[in-house]
Amino acid sequence: MKMSFRWYGKKDPVTLEEIKAIPGMQGIVTAVYDVPVGQAWPLENILELKKMVEEAGLEITVIESIPVHEDIKQGKPNRDALIENYKTSIRNVGAAGIPVVCYNFMPVFDWTRSDLHHPLPDGSTSLAFLKSDLAGVDPVADDLNLPGWDSSYSKEEMKAIIENYRQNISEEDLWANLEYFIKAILPTAEEAGVKMAIHPDDPPYGIFGLPRIITGQEAVERFLNLYDSEHNGITMCVGSYASDPKNDVLAMTEYALKRNRINFMHTRNVTAGAWGFQETAHLSQAGDIDMNAVVKLLVDYDWQGSLRPDHGRRIWGDQTKTPGYGLYDRALGATYFNGLYEANMRAAGKTPDFGIKAKTVGTKEG
């Protein structure tokens, strides 16, 4: 297992040097952020990003993400041209030696929360989705701009896209469009040596009358059966799935491990109920997920992928503007999961490797 960390490129206030100092940190999860959605990523942009990361003593373990254009999700006539661009991006990621691409097929937005600074009992704040905050709210009728929505669209464009989904695209239509996309890109991913890892809907249930399809166990089974290849896998985001209390994330994790289809791990903890959900500290007791049991499954199945501590609380005066992506709590999460990994590896009679090549600098002989 390679511990990895999300980094938003040169504009990220969290630096590669700070990330490198986290014990056992090996990988960077990032993307090319200066190419518009729908256009192909040039190889030189990817190689420039890779060089920057490697000069800091890290490696890019996952691209998160190559965004899927809304016209592909909606099955519009221009989707084939957009898919060709997507395939070019996959080829170039593979040519750069990066093994995994995380992506999603969520309509309109990547994630939705109603509060970015909801208080927790320990005095910190975190991201929350409170259904009561959104009761009666209509993103088409109201002047609404929630976190996680694609800012590249104007409000009028956003409203038109939402209305098109509501009027013309059912969940089965979205499944059909996803299947079309998967069957088009997976042969390219296989040839390029890139494993694809779809992220679940966040939250994993319907909101605002929009179709949601990557939501739980049955959806994962259906998705994996669309294209039977280890290159067609999932991002097992335990926090996203656990945001719906109906989901048994341990059973889901083991199911996907048995099929060797977890291509990326996100480990955030949440507490959830009929009221919605709130993200918590990573510690098992802080939320609803037995994180030790999750890591034990990864060890039991000799999982070799990349894991990143997903989202963090705002603690210790962290002023990072990107919600959930401050340095401090994610660094705590990384060391926590590395600790769980080492304990479970040693209990299994195995020796963990955190990629540490030197224990000090220079010679110490007199």
Swiss-Prot record:
Its cofactor is Fe(2+); Mn(2+). Pathway: Carbohydrate metabolism; pentose and glucuronate interconversion. The keyword Hydrolase does not apply. It holds the Pfam family UxuA. Belongs to the mannonate dehydratase family. Catalyzes the dehydration of D-mannonate. This is Mannonate dehydratase.
